Amino acid sequence: LTTIIPILLAVAFLTLLERKVLGYMQLRKGPNIVGPYGLLQPIADAVKLFIKEPLQPLTSSLALFIIAPTLALTLALMMWIPLPMPHPLINMNLSILFMLALSSLAVYAILWSGWASNSKYALIGALRAVAQTISYEVTLAIIILSILLMNGSFTLSTLITTQEYTWLIMPSWPLAMMWFISTIAETNRAPFDLTEGESELVSGFNVEYAGGPFALFFLAEYANIIMMNALTIILFLGAYNNSTFPEMYTANFMLKALLFTTFFLWIRASYPRFRYDQLMHLLWKNFLPLTLVMCMWHVTL
């Protein structure tokens, strides 16, 4: 509970931040009616979504239809367990592997939701999402492997000591760039949000969801965004952990995560969506060879 509630609160205010950032980038105010400066908007949205009647298509598979959003949110929250801030919830030896396994499992939630809706749009959206997530996980795994070679251990907590004197982004900035772009693709954000191409697929895999279940998907997506940014910070921009003031580490860490999250929103406001083939070309023809070469280079170091 100590992590779940703050994460959900962070997600709520991230939605507000996103609407504000996009608003100001389009020369308008964003939500500013509910509460001072629109601060109560996310709470109003949540209440509205959860008191709506959850619709369920007649032809859909009920069990999977309900399980998919709950699984998505559960996995999104479980990913936070091994993150050191500065101490993880559960200190695992193979925390990186745990996170990779969970992020691969998240594909199932998307696949089930699209398949159980029994709608063509949802199915196409889900298939796209699955292909995209699985593809980009390949580069993420290789980049993580390269970082672990410098770290010398599978535990995330040791990255803090590794980066005491210099950030890992310095020796491996091409990896950091590819990692950042891959995290955007992994979390299905613009310009990689092919799963919900409004012009062609209405809303993608969650097209048949309304009310509560839709809110769960929404929460899962944004929790994943914050989590991926937190992981980026841990891997490449390790905050300095001063043992006398551990609070400073958390503040430093969260400030960087906030900056990266704002960067995500900035990218969303700036760039148009990719075509599906461009997305796959970028990964299999550009990122994969590059990451493999970098990984080999790190092995030789």
Curated annotation (Swiss-Prot):
Annotated EC: 7.1.1.2
Transmembrane parts of this sequence: 4-24, 62-82, 96-116, 140-160, 165-185, 216-236, 247-267, 279-299
Superkingdom in the source lineage: Eukaryota
GO terms of biological process kind: aerobic respiration
Key word Translocase present: yes
Enzyme class: translocase
InterPro entries for this protein: NADH_UbQ_OxRdtase_su1/FPO, NADH_UbQ_OxRdtase_su1_CS
Record bears the keyword Translocase: yes
Disulfide topology: none
Annotated Pfam families: NADHdh
Catalytic activity: a ubiquinone + NADH + 5 H(+)(in) = a ubiquinol + NAD(+) + 4 H(+)(out)
Topology class, membrane: Multi-pass membrane protein
GO cellular component, as recorded: mitochondrial inner membrane
UniProt keyword terms in alphabetical order: Electron transport, Membrane, Mitochondrion, Mitochondrion inner membrane, NAD, Respiratory chain, Translocase, Transmembrane, Transmembrane helix, Transport, Ubiquinone
GO terms for MF: NADH dehydrogenase (ubiquinone) activity
Subcellular location field: Mitochondrion inner membrane
Family: Belongs to the complex I subunit 1 family.
Purpose of the protein: Core subunit of the mitochondrial membrane respiratory chain NADH dehydrogenase (Complex I) that is believed to belong to the minimal assembly required for catalysis. Complex I functions in the transfer of electrons from NADH to the respiratory chain. The immediate electron acceptor for the enzyme is believed to be ubiquinone.
Protein name, UniProt field: NADH-ubiquinone oxidoreductase chain 1
Annotated organism of origin: Nyctalus noctula
Record lineage: Eukaryota, Metazoa, Chordata, Craniata, Vertebrata
Gene: MT-ND1
